[in-house]
C-alpha cells in the first residue's frame, strides 16, 4: 500500500480540494483523518461544483472507496445531508463507497449549542470557532464521556450517554435551547440508516491492504493543530502528519509522499495572531480578487503576504516531500509582492525558522519582508510552467529555495479543475 497524505500548511482554506480531487482519480482508497463538518472545500468536477465538509472528496472518483476515520467527529444529520446533495448532483453510487469508523465520535446539536455559549463567555477573547460544536465534542472525547459512532447501535447505551451529556451541560450552563428527547427521537431513524456505513477501521484496512494508492485527505491545517498551531486559536484535533498517522493507524513506512498545500499568499478565518496580515489596500485587494470567503461559514477571510517563517515551521513538523502552491493568479495585478522572511521579537531577537508558542507574543512581533517584482500579466489557466511570466517563476523558485529545496510540484492558476501546472 502506497500512502499519499495531503495537508494544509497554513491556517486552512489553502485549496486542498483540487489536488485531492486530482490525486483521487488514481486512488483506490481515500480517507479523512480528523475534524468534522467544520472543514470545507469546493471541487469543480465535470463542470459541477461540489462542496465537501465531512465527506472525503474522493467520492467524485467512481473507482475510489472512502473512509471517515477514527479521529473525526461526525454530525450525523450533516453526513446524510451532504451525501444526499452529492447523489442529487449525479454521484448516484456515493452511498456505496463511503464508510465511517465505529470509533469516530458523534457531534450532536447539543455540542453546537454549547459551542455558542462557550464563545459568548470568552467575550473579546473569542477563539472564532465555526460554531459547529467541534470543540465541545472533542472535549467530551478527551474527558472520556463522548459517544462513539458504534455506540449509536446500542439504543440503551446511546440514550443513557446522551442524557448524561445533556445533564452535565445543563448543570454547567443552566437551561439550554436544546431538547435531548427530540434528538434521541431523531437517532431512532439514523440508527437504521447508519448500519451499512459503520465499520471496524482496522478490519476495513485489512480488507484493502492491497490498495495500490491510498490518499489521506487532511482537514484544516498545521497552524490550526491543537498541539502545534497558534493555541488557543486552533481547532480541537491534530491536523498535521502525526495526527493522520494516529487517527488512521497508518504504517509510517508505507507513506510515499506528504504534500503540503500553501496559498501564494496567506489567509486566516476567525481570531488569533496573524503576523503578515495586511489591514490595508493590499489585504483588501487579496480578499476581493481572491474571493476569500469561507466555504463552511461564509465568513470573510483575513489576508496577508506569504509567510516563510510560518511555512518553515510547518515544513519542520509535517516533513513535506512536495508542495502545491495555489491561487498564483490572484497575484497577477500586483506591482510588487512581499514575503515575510523573519519575525523580530520585542527584545530584538530575530526568528526565521522557529515559531513562538505564545499567542500574545505573536501579536507583538515585527515582520521583516523582502519585496519581489510582480508580473502584471494574466496567469489564469496557464498549464505549463514555462508559459508563466519570468517573475512568477522567480517567485515560485524563491519560495522553493527558502523552504530548503522542497519542490513546488503543483501550481494552481485558477478555480477550474484543469487550472493546474504539474512540474515533473
UniProtKB/Swiss-Prot annotation:
The active site is at 13 (proton acceptor), 41 (proton donor). Substrate binds at residues 295-301. GO terms for cellular component: cytoplasm. Mg(2+) binds at residues 13, 40. Binds 1 Mg(2+) ion per subunit. One of its GO terms (molecular function) is adenylosuccinate synthase activity. It is found in: Cytoplasm. CDD domains: AdSS. It catalyses: IMP + L-aspartate + GTP = N(6)-(1,2-dicarboxyethyl)-AMP + GDP + phosphate + 2 H(+). It comes from the Eukaryota. InterPro entries: Adenylosuccin_syn_GTP-bd, Adenylosuccin_syn_Lys_AS, Adenylosuccinate_synth_dom1, Adenylosuccinate_synth_dom2, Adenylosuccinate_synth_dom3, Adenylosuccinate_synthetase, P-loop_NTPase. Its main location: cytoplasm. GO terms for biological process: 'de novo' AMP biosynthetic process; cellular response to cadmium ion; IMP metabolic process. It is an enzyme of class 6 (ligase). Its cofactor is Mg(2+). IMP binds at residues 13-16, 38-41, 130, 144, 220, 235, 299. GTP binds at residues 12-18, 40-42, 301, 327-329, 412-414. Its EC number is 6.3.4.4. Pathway: Purine metabolism; AMP biosynthesis via de novo pathway; AMP from IMP: step 1/2. Keywords: Cytoplasm, GTP-binding, Ligase, Magnesium, Metal-binding, Nucleotide-binding, Purine biosynthesis. Plays an important role in the de novo pathway and in the salvage pathway of purine nucleotide biosynthesis. Catalyzes the first committed step in the biosynthesis of AMP from IMP. Belongs to the adenylosuccinate synthetase family. This is Adenylosuccinate synthetase. The lineage of its organism: Eukaryota, Fungi, Dikarya, Ascomycota, Pezizomycotina.
Amino acid at each position: 500500500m502506497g500512502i499519499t497524505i495531503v495537508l494544509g500548511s497554513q491556517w486552512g482554506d489553502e485549496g486542498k480540494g483540487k489536488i485531492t480531487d486530482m490525486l483521487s482519480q488514481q486512488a483506490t482508497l481515500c480517507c479523512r483523518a480528523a475534524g468534522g463538518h467544520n472543514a470545507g472545500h469546493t471541487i469543480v468536477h465535470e463542470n459541477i461544483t461540489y462542496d465537501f465538509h465531512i465527506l472525503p472528496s474522493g467520492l467524485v472518483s467512481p473507482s475510489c472507496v472512502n473512509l471517515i476515520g477514527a479521529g473525526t467527529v461526525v454530525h450525523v444529520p450533516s453526513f446524510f445531508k451532504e451525501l444526499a446533495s452529492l447523489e442529487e448532483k449525479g454521484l448516484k453510487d456515493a452511498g456505496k463507497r463511503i464508510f465511517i469508523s465505529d470509533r469516530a465520535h458523534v457531534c450532536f446539536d447539543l455540542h453546537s449549542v454549547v459551542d455558542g455559549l462557550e464563545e459568548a463567555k470568552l467575550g473579546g477573547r473569542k477563539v472564532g470557532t465555526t460554531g459547529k460544536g467541534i470543540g465541545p465534542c472533542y472535549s467530551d472525547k478527551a474527558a472520556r464521556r463522548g459517544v462513539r459512532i458504534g455506540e449509536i447501535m446500542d439504543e440503551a447505551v446511546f440514550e443513557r450517554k446522551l442524557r448524561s451529556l445533556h445533564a452535565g451541560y445543563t448543570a454547567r450552563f443552566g437551561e439550554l435551547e436544546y431538547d435531548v428527547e427530540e434528538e434521541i427521537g431523531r437517532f431512532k431513524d439514523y440508527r437504521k440508516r447508519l448500519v451499512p456505513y459503520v465499520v471496524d477501521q482496522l478490519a476495513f484496512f485489512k480488507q484493502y491492504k492491497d490498495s495500490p494508492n491510498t490518499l489521506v485527505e487532511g482537514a484544516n491545517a498545521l497552524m490550526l493543530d491543537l498541539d502545534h498551531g497558534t493555541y488557543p486559536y486552533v481547532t480541537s484535533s491534530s491536523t498535521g502528519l502525526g495526527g493522520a498517522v494516529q487517527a488512521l493507524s497508518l504504517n509510517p513506512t508505507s507513506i510515499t509522499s506528504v504534500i503540503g498545500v500553501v496559498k501564494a499568499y496567506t489567509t486566516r478565518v476567525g481570531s488569533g495572531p496573524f503576523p503578515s496580515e495586511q489591514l490595508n489596500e493590499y489585504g483588501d485587494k487579496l480578499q476581493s480578487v481572491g474571493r476569500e470567503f469561507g466555504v463552511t461559514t461564509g465568513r470573510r477571510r483575513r489576508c496577508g503576504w506569504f509567510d516563510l517563517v510560518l511555512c518553515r515551521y510547518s515544513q519542520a513538523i509535517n516533513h513535506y516531500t512536495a508542495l502545491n502552491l495555489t491561487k498564483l493568479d490572484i497575484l497577477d495585478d500586483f506591482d510588487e509582492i512581499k514575503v515575510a522572511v523573519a519575525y523580530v521579537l520585542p527584545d530584538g531577537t530575530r526568528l526565521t525558522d522557529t515559531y513562538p508558542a505564545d499567542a500574545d507574543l505573536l501579536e507583538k512581533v515585527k515582520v521583516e519582508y523582502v519585496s519581489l517584482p510582480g508580473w502584471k500579466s494574466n496567469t489564469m489557466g496557464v498549464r505549463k510552467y514555462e508559459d508563466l511570466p519570468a517573475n512568477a517563476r522567480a517567485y515560485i523558485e524563491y519560495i522553493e529555495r527558502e523552504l530548503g529545496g522542497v519542490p513546488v510540484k503543483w501550481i494552481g492558476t485558477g478555480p477550474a479543475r484543469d487550472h493546474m501546472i504539474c512540474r515533473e
